[in-house]
Structures are given as structure tokens and as C-alpha cells.
Curated annotation (Swiss-Prot):
Job description of the protein: Transcriptional regulator which is part of the latency-replication switch system that decides at the onset of infection whether to replicate and lyse the host or to lysogenize (latency) and keep the host viable. Activates the transcription of the aimX locus. Transcriptional activation of aimX seems to lead to the productive viral replication (lytic cycle), aimX possibly acting as a regulatory non-coding RNA.
Domain of life: Viruses
Subunit structure: Homodimer. Interacts with the viral arbitrium peptide, this interaction changes the oligomeric state of AimR from an active dimer to an inactive monomer leading to lysogeny.
Gene: aimR
Name this protein carries in UniProt: AimR transcriptional regulator
Organism: Bacillus phage SPbeta (Bacillus phage SPBc2)
Lineage: Viruses, Duplodnaviria, Heunggongvirae, Uroviricota, Caudoviricetes
GO biological process: latency-replication decision
Amino acid sequence: MELIRIAMKKDLENDNSLMNKWATVAGLKNPNPLYDFLNHDGKTFNEFSSIVNIVKSQYPDREYELMKDYCLNLDVKTKAARSALEYADANMFFEIEDVLIDSMISCSNMKSKEYGKVYKIHRELSNSVITEFEAVKRLGKLNIKTPEMNSFSRLLLLYHYLSTGNFSPMAQLIKQIDLSEISENMYIRNTYQTRVHVLMSNIKLNENSLEECREYSKKALESTNILRFQVFSYLTIGNSLLFSNYELAQENFLKGLSISVQNENYNMIFQQALCFLNNVWRKENKWINFESDSIMDLQEQAHCFINFNENSKAKEVLDKLDLLVHNDNELAMHYYLKGRLEQNKACFYSSIEYFKKSNDKFLIRLPLLELQKMGENQKLLELLLL
């Protein structure tokens, strides 16, 4: 018997009113499906969200333990297992996901097999095991049949473009996703909808459509209880306010920080965001990470040194960065910082060039503002912003 059934039965012995509470949390019209679930091993709910919501409300500190045990005991040929695969990926529970992927690929159910193969490509692309070209080629060979994987095959490419700073293809690709085709599995449809909201908020941020950016982030927050999506929604709202409202940007970053205290990776993301915010506004910066050698953290070290006229230290860091391989978006920031240090117009124009190559219409403001201060033609700068 799975751990979740054992835990629920034990709690019911002490408080039988929990049955009605759980039915409400699970979105059930009455407790009957709960009785079936508790009294028949292998029985699942019609929608995966029911078990997720019960675990989150009753056992929040044991979610990973209970859901791992539950997911890995599911028959991989079922709708519940396919939902579990999306649950694992959405929550970045990769140990659960990888076991499910391997089991699904080798199972006899064609639908589950297709899910396994598509999510396998997603994992390998995310981990740089394969290139974008190889991913697209393998997806094409699958001749995808299910509407869920038709959508996810596009979502996985969108995540790749976002992570590599290649924003140019994203707006057109996301238009190809039609979630109305998904009718069998509402859990997957709803999580994919949240994914689309989060991705759209990033697309709108990089298009400099900031009101729309915040609207998509708010839709994501309203539609999910998944920490990952909540975190990146607060992050994007904060980023959208980066140049216009220091206090509100900081407020959203701190909200994200507060909900991610137990997640080291998310905690680091918000510390980096708060660091960048303080550097942009040229404030005292307690968020600098002097222990890290990542490109982002090194750039923010240099950024802080430049703000406080510690030019020799800034140059030392930028010289170190010159030896590292950057993507276009990172190069844009690198040239912006060199321009700040040297008061060099050519560097600011190089920064603009690379922001344009990565299609980042938001952070391109950084070099444009510096050129404006240097007296460059305002009309020219407005044209460069297009």
C-alpha cells in the first residue's frame, strides 16, 4: 500500500471529519471517490490534481516523499501515470521523472510510450545531451499522435530558447500551441496553460510589453500551486518593474525569496535578481555573491565595482570574463559593463547589437540610457529601440 493511503487512513482514525475536507480540497462533489481510493489498492482519482491537492494541504512537508512513492507505484500505461510524468517535470522532481520516462518508453501502451519519448527529448535537450537540431529531428521522426505531446513538443523548444537567451523564435512558436485540443486530461491541460502563461510573460518582457508581461504572470499565479511557476512569475513581475519602480520590483523579488527559502536554486535566483536590481539603481548592494564564478555573478561583481568607482577591481573581473564563452545575451551585458567602465560609445553600440541578436528589447535600455547621457541623437536611439 502506498504511503499516502497509509497516512490518510491513520489521520482519519483520529479525525473522520477530514473526509469532507479532503473531498473539497480535491475538487470532488462528494467523498465517495475518496472511499474508493482508500479502500482499493491501485485505485486512482479521475484527475491527478485531486491527490496533489490533498497532499499539499494535509502533508505539505512530505510532498516529495509521498508523491514519489505514489507516482512510482502507478501503472505506467494509465492516464494517472502520464499525469505523474508532467507533475514530476513541472516540479523539477527529476528522479521521479527519469524513472517514469524509462518505464513508459518500454511499456506496451502507445500513448504512454509517446509521452516517455517526448519527455526524454526534453530532458536530454535541457541537459545539453543533444542539440536543438537533434531534438527537432527526433521529434519529427516520432510522428506525434496525442494532442498533449503535440503541445509539449513545442513547449520543450520554448524552454530551450529561453534558457539559451534566444528569444527570437519564441513569439511565433508559442502561437502554434492549441490547448483546446486536450480534452482527456485536464490536469495536464491546466499545467500546460500555466506554462504558457509563464512563457508568455517572458516573451512580453523581452518585447518590452511590460503591462502584458505582468498580466500573464498574474494569470500564472492565479492558476497554479506549483512552486516553480509561482517563483518565476514573481521574478518576471519584478523584472518588468526593474527600471520604473525600485520598491515594487524589490517587493516582488522578496515575495519570491520568501516562498523559496527551502529551495537553494530558487533562493539563489532571487538573490541574483535583488543584486541586479540594486546595481541598476546604483544602491548599496548586500546581495553580491563574491564566492561564485558564474558569468552572471561575475558580471554583477563588476557592475557593483563600476557603480562605486572601484575601476581597477571592475577591470580585473571583466578581464576574467573575457576568457569565458558567452551567449548573445551575456555578451550584450558584458559590452554594457565595458562601456560603463571605459565610457566607450563603441562598447555601448556592441551591447545594443548583441541585445538585438538575442531579441531582448527590455535590457537593451541599459546601453541606450548611457548613450542618451553621452548626448547621442535621441531620434537615433529611439530607432535602435524598435
